[in-house]
Amino acid sequence: MIFSTLEHILTHISFSIISVVITIQLMNLLVHELVQLGDASEKGMIATFFSITGLLVTRWIYSGHFPLSDLYESLIFLSWSFSIIHMVPYFRNHRNHFSAITAPSAIFTQGFATSGLLTEMHQSIILVPALQSQWLMMHVSMMLLSYAALLCGSLLSVALLVITFRKNSDIFDKRNNFLIRSFFFGEIEYLNEKRSVLQNTSFDSFTNYHKYQLTQRLDFWSYRVISLGFIFLTIGILSGAVWANEAWGSYWNWDPKEIWAFITWAIFAIYLHTRTNHSLQGANSAIVASIGFLIIWICYFGVNLLGIGLHSYGSFTLISN
């Protein structure tokens, strides 16, 4: 009872804090950027991380197993993964380049997890025999970390496509400066140092230069984050194959979840391959990553919504039955 109450409190604390963080970011975007509010939002994400960590640890203690056994627990862990990705660049150089993506992603996943749709999953149950394995932590955690990284990288690619195909005059107005502030990494300072070079350039050339710099940074960080997610995904698939052999007697069973995991892996393998070809970098590779964004959600939610296959643990169908 105590652990259940503590979990309930931590859930509401983390959701409330991240809601405040989103509000602060919207204020900076729509009204005016304030350094104090920006620092407060970063500290809020740190507090959210510790709240979700406490939530996972609490559920781990009273359930007796690592909290990755159903859709509710996996969504909480996915939200926790987004908060990690949010904090890593901040602690490295006190700048956050992913705040426009990670904070909304975290509140979306946690909001869905705590919604009424998954109420019956909030109570921990005894694991079925197939899930009572040391591979549970390894396989599922790697898959969810890969989903978080690949989703963030894919959203960066989506942003790249939006900027690439919009008119230059719309890119650098007041309404879009939030994304610019997130990814310019000192390009403004560089331009000030090189002001003499740009004195005779037209406004179109100036905005085109900024657009080029922004898309290059988006492409660069999308590649780095997706590469990390691809490594996690590969480890997750391989560890899952070993676990499947122990549980079901075969490394690969062509289960719907396995098929979509392979499709996801193939899509991002194609993305990484296109990045090795200089002529295909930028918008071309971003299109592949954007397709991958949709594939990830199909892979993650598809089986849980349909409740079919060997990976249907914690699905909506299973719970309703």
Swiss-Prot record:
Membrane-spanning ranges: 9-29, 44-64, 71-91, 98-118, 143-163, 225-245, 252-272, 286-306
**Cross-referenced Pfam families:** Cytochrom_C_asm
Please provide the record's keywords in A-Z order: Chloroplast, Cytochrome c-type biogenesis, Membrane, Plastid, Thylakoid, Transmembrane, Transmembrane helix
Q: Which GO terms describe its molecular function?
A: heme binding
Residue ranges the record marks as coiled coil: none
Q: Name one GO biological process term.
A: cytochrome complex assembly
Report the GO terms under cellular component. chloroplast thylakoid membrane; plasma membrane
Where is this chain primarily localised? plastid
Topology in the membrane?
Answer: Multi-pass membrane protein
Entry's localization field: Plastid, Chloroplast thylakoid membrane
Disulphide-bridged cysteine pairs: none
Q: How does it assemble?
A: May interact with Ccs1.
Q: Which family does it belong to?
A: Belongs to the CcmF/CycK/Ccl1/NrfE/CcsA family.
Job of this protein? Required during biogenesis of c-type cytochromes (cytochrome c6 and cytochrome f) at the step of heme attachment.
Q: What is this protein called?
A: Cytochrome c biogenesis protein CcsA
